[in-house]
Each structure stands twice: as structure tokens, then as C-alpha cells.
């Protein structure tokens, strides 16, 4: 059986919002949610919601019950039938990859084919997308430079 391939569609404006949030804190990870829709093989990001009430550490970001409640409340303001299609988070000076904890979040909450995550390393100035496909999380494309200038050497 052929694997279903999805295209990720995210505007430069929304990418800038994601990067600005990820560049705002380099002592701990930050993150948020990607709202949008799945249309004809495309994962279309239409809104970004910064995660609130997280338990953040240098190498880990945890979404608490309050985090999810706040995200769903914000989604209801955007559109009553808004769809959560993914999430984003930073890896300050750790590179672009998914840790075991990140993979857990993706496979538990965003396991449906086409659900996405983007990782941003503000120190190294890199970002990369990952996508759920066939019960796995795989890199969507090669990592690329962020539009904001990296914060470290």
C-alpha cells in the first residue's frame, strides 16, 4: 500500500509568530498549538496558540491539564469547529529532533496521519517539521534556517 503523503501549509506570518515565541525564551522550552484543517492531503495551519500553564524545563515541555483547557478555550474563540492539527516547541541549543518525550506527545495527542509538529532551535537558528504517518512520526523535510537570526554561535 502506498503511503499517504501530506503537504504542510503554513504562512510566513504564522511561521514568524512561532519563531518569535520560540526565540523569546532560551532557558527553558516554550511551545504552543497549531490550529487548522486537513484538506485534500494538506495539513493547513491557520492559527497559532501559545501554550499557557506549561511545566517547562531546559530540555522538556509538558502540557498540563490547564494548558489543554486554555488551548481549547482559545480555539473556541477562533472558530467553534476549529481543529487542533499539531503543536510546536523550542529546543534551545539542542538541535532539531524529537526527543522520546516529544514523540510521546505526538503519538498520544497528534497520531492521526497528517498531524504535525515543528521544532525551533533559537540558539542555532534552525527549524524542522515532523509529521505523523502510518502510526509513526517522521521528518517532513530537511531542517532549515529560521528567518530570525540565530542567538548563538
What spans do the regions from the language model cover?
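Conserved beta-strand-loop surface patch within small alpha/beta domains used
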Residues: 1-84, 93-153
